[in-house]
A protein has these predicted regions:
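N-terminal signal-anchor transmembrane segment
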Residues: 2-95, 121, 405-411, 422
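Membrane-interfacial helix-loop-helix modules of multi-pass inner-membrane proteins that assemble, modify
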Residues: 58-66, 158, 169-208
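Long extracytoplasmic/lumenal interhelical loops at the membrane interface
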Residues: 64-68, 185, 307-371
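Aromatic-anchored transmembrane helix interface
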Residues: 108-118, 127-152
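Alpha-helical transmembrane segments of multi-pass inner-membrane proteins
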Residues: 161-185, 206-249, 254-267
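Transmembrane alpha-helices of multi-pass inner-membrane enzymes
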Residues: 220, 399-409, 416-457
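A conserved mid-to-late transmembrane alpha helix and its immediate loop/hinge
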Residues: 242, 250, 354-389
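Hydrophobic transmembrane alpha-helices and their immediate junctions
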Residues: 285, 370-410, 433, 441-443
Length: 457
């Protein structure tokens, strides 16, 4: 009788609320691992994301970075593949609507950001504002990927770790090759025009500043995450990536990596001394590096390795002045324009007059100027909740990566324009900071207790 009543109550609730039934069915199935095609599809998405730049796509006739051409080419191929993998997974789940409810229930902030971005995309199109493709690649893609990675098993995450380390190592080696030979293999192009006077390395990530941002984030992840790698291997990768940072010429990324990385290593060293637990091998490696690194830097400097980077610190091509001039644009706008967004032609004219043709180097200021403060506030709330959700799925060392990411965001247009940076960040965070999954208690110690029988009387 009790069993029948419980089943009857469940059916009644599902009949009254179909969404609850879908969510319940999804919860029951969510424990199972994803199928092999979805797993390898996610690996392919990450490989395309990190290894294929706009300059590489131009060689096959895909004008991703340009302003002209087919609108379909303004979305990165990794985003298209991600949507296909998502559709496949929804179909194989058995109930596409139930699948979407399930992953939204597991990652609500990601679902909110995706829905909010799609709604704002419709608003952008209706108001004929720029940034249509930016809404998809910048916000929808990372939210969708986070929701799909919630189902990932250990094998999938192990493959993703391998892809990240291999591609980032290849990216650094290619950057150093370009730096040494003064030849760009896949130069950054805008509508087919390559900026050949800018000899900063582009490697696999495209624009030098995008390269510098991703590399800096990866170095911080090697310091406080990547626990699956041995310490000597991590130190070698950190050295290689720091050398690549010089080739990319990112001043903010270089300074941030040195300051945050140095502070983190100092804190870890002091913590080890305070607890009295000092790893002898780690201490020996630290002493050796402390002796060799200054020598290596001096030798590299004598061969002119840092000349290009130092030149960018001396002459920033008006970058510092642009960060001051961008605030002057608000003096020409009314409050209504600030709230809902001014006329695009007016903003473009003010930019040319103020010498800001190269861009507005702050995402919040740029988004307010082009989309309005109300639009920007909505995205900011969604972004904050999304970052909090990502951080909760990582182990404690994520604070270093999150701090570096939030600082670097404000040194360029970043999220206010079309970019794949946030997708790359969430992949690095979720994959390299994945908590160690322990064995269930039932397997570790004792057998689960048998359920008591329910009397039928």
């Amino acid at each position: 009788m009790t069993t029948v009543r419980a089943a009857t109550g469940t059916v009644a609730r599902e009949a009254a609320n179909p969404a609850a039934g879908w969510a319940g069915q999804a919860t029951a199935r969510s424990g199972s691992s994803i199928d092999w095609l979805t797993g390898f599809g996610l690996v392919g998405v990450v490989a395309l994301l990190f290894a294929v730049s706009g300059g590489m796509l131009w060689l096959v006739g895909y004008n991703y970075d340009g302003l002209t051409g087919n609108p379909a080419t303004k979305i990165h191929p990794s985003t298209y593949l991600l949507v296909l993998v998502f559709a496949w997974r929804a179909c194989t789940f058995g109930n596409p609507v139930g699948y979407m409810v399930a992953i939204a229930d597991r990652r609500p902030a990601s679902a909110l950001l995706a829905v909010m971005s799609i709604v704002l995309l419709v608003v952008v199109i209706a108001r004929q504002r720029p940034g249509m493709a930016g809404m998809i690649d910048t916000f929808v893609a990372p939210a969708l990927l986070v929701m799909m990675l919630a189902e990932g098993d250990e094998k999938t995450f192990a493959r993703l770790r391998t892809v990240i380390h291999v591609v980032m190592t290849a990216n650094a080696l290619l950057a150093l090759f370009e730096f040494a030979t003064k030849t760009l293999i896949f130069p950054y192009r805008l509508d087919g025009e390559a900026f050949m006077t800018d000899l900063r390395s582009t490697a696999l990530q495209g624009h030098p500043l995008s390269n510098a941002t991703v590399t800096s984030i990866y170095v911080l992840a090697l310091l406080s995450g990547s626990r699956s790698l041995s310490m000597p291997l991590r130190l070698c990768l950190i050295g290689l990536q720091c050398a690549a940072l010089v080739a990319f010429g990112g001043r903010s990324a270089m300074v941030l990596t040195i300051v945050l990385g140095g502070c983190y290593m100092l804190l870890q060293g002091l913590r080890g001394l305070s607890t009295g637990r000092v790893n002898l091998l780690g201490a020996a490696l630290g002493l050796i590096l402390a002796a060799l690194v200054p020598v290596a830097i001096a030798v590299a400097a004598s061969y002119g390795f840092f000349d290009a980077l130092l030149e960018r610190f001396v002459s920033d091509s008006g970058s510092a002045n642009a960060r001051v001039e961008m605030f002057e644009l608000f003096n020409h706008l009314e409050w209504r324009d600030v709230i809902v967004g001014p006329d695009i032609d007016l903003i473009e004219s003010l930019r040319r007059i103020s010498g800001l043709e190269q861009g507005i180097e702050n995402p919040v200021i740029r988004m307010v100027l082009y989309q309005g403060a109300f639009f920007t506030l909505l995205l900011f709330v969604g972004f904050a909740l999304f970052m909090h959700e990502v951080a909760r799925r990582c182990h404690a060392g994520i604070w270093l990566l999150m701090l570096g990411w939030l600082i670097l965001l404000n040194t360029s247009e970043s999220l206010a324009s079309k970019t794949t940076l946030m997708t790359k960040f969430v992949v690095i965070a979720l994959v390299l900071y994945r908590p160690v999954v322990g064995r269930p208690k039932a397997q570790a110690g004792h057998r689960p207790q048998a359920q008591p029988r329910v009397s039928s009387s």
